Swiss-Prot record:
Catalyzed reactions: chlorophyllide a + oxidized 2[4Fe-4S]-[ferredoxin] + 2 ADP + 2 phosphate = protochlorophyllide a + reduced 2[4Fe-4S]-[ferredoxin] + 2 ATP + 2 H2O
Binding-site list for Mg(2+): S16
Encoding gene, per UniProt annotation: bchL
Enzyme class: oxidoreductase
Organism: Pelodictyon phaeoclathratiforme (strain DSM 5477 / BU-1)
One of the GO BP terms on file: light-independent bacteriochlorophyll biosynthetic process
Record's protein name: Light-independent protochlorophyllide reductase iron-sulfur ATP-binding protein
Species lineage: Bacteria, Pseudomonadati, Chlorobiota, Chlorobiia, Chlorobiales
Length: 275
């Protein structure tokens, strides 16, 4: 039985880069990993495969949307450290529903019997709006992970994600493993002062603190995980949080919880204390 992870977070904060490095850390510790990109941009797995791979929606179009004609080989690419990758894709901009495509991709995984093939399945999910389709991975996940930066908009999105996780936990097994603080800047960004307060308020913890570092940014442009980058004096500092997350997830019984989200208006009141 696979360990299923659902990684969410506000768009544009490095969620896919973080997801790819978590997958890499787990794979290098011996896990057979499948990473699934659930975003119409279909660039989640770019750091692992080094390219924009064919999406599920593109593969379905080729067979006139007859699911039964697709095999795993039609939609999965293998990349760094033997990580298998799948991209749900989405409809053309301005038409259709990206969430629906995610739901269909999850159903296709079931049809192909892929859930039992892997030690870890990681869903990297667009997380600004958790509608029915984009929330589908929570139906299967053991743990959700929220990626956030130390700013109000990111924390507001994280709180909405906590609401979705709490709602799903009523019917499904999913729990919140914690929050990954990304792009942590102690010089101009306040470190994690806001995230620390928020995590305590909703009953969770910071899993790791990923530094704001040029090397991580460069790895994304290079189409590589941090583990595949050339060795430099700062590389170990950048790898440390991803290794910490992987170590937490592969322990026998990771401590996780159902979050207790804050009301929207209460979040705005908290802002005054963060100025």
């Amino acid at each position: 039985m696979s360990l299923v992870l659902a990684v969410y977070g506000k768009g544009g904060i490095g969620k896919s880069t973080t997801s790819a490095n978590i997958s890499a850390a787990l794979a290098l510790k011996g896990a057979k990993v499948l990473q699934i990109g659930c975003d119409p941009k279909h660039d989640s797995t770019f750091p692992i495969t080094g390219k924009l791979q064919k999406t599920v929606i593109e593969a379905l179009e080729e067979v006139d949307f007859h699911h039964e004609e697709l095999s795993a080989e039609d939609i999965i690419e293998t990349g760094f450290a033997g990580i298998d990758c799948l991209e749900a894709g989405g409809p053309p901009a301005g038409s259709g529903c990206g969430g629906y495509v995610v739901g269909e991709s999850v159903a296709l995984l079931q049809e192909l019997g892929l859930y039992d093939k892997y030690d870890v399945i990681l869903f990297d999910v667009l997380g600004d709006v958790v509608c029915g389709g984009f929330s589908a991975p929570l139906n299967y996940a053991d743990y959700a992970i929220i990626i956030a930066t130390n700013d109000f908009d990111s924390i507001f999105a994280a709180n909405r994600l906590c609401m979705a996780i709490q709602q799903k936990s009523v019917r499904y097994k999913v729990k919140l493993a914690g929050i990954v603080a990304n792009r942590v800047d102690y010089v101009t960004g306040g470190g994690t002062n806001m995230l620390d307060q928020f995590a305590e308020k909703v009953g969770t913890k910071l899993l790791a603190k990923v530094p704001y570092h040029e090397l991580i940014r460069k790895s994304r442009f290079a189409g590589k995980t941090m583990y595949a980058m050339e060795d430099t004096p700062d590389k170990e500092e950048c790898l440390k949080p991803y290794n910490e997350i992987a170590d937490f997830l592969i322990q026998e019984s990771p401590i996780a919880s159902v979050p207790v989200p804050i009301g929207d208006r209460e979040i705005f009141k908290m802002v005054n204390g963060w100025q």
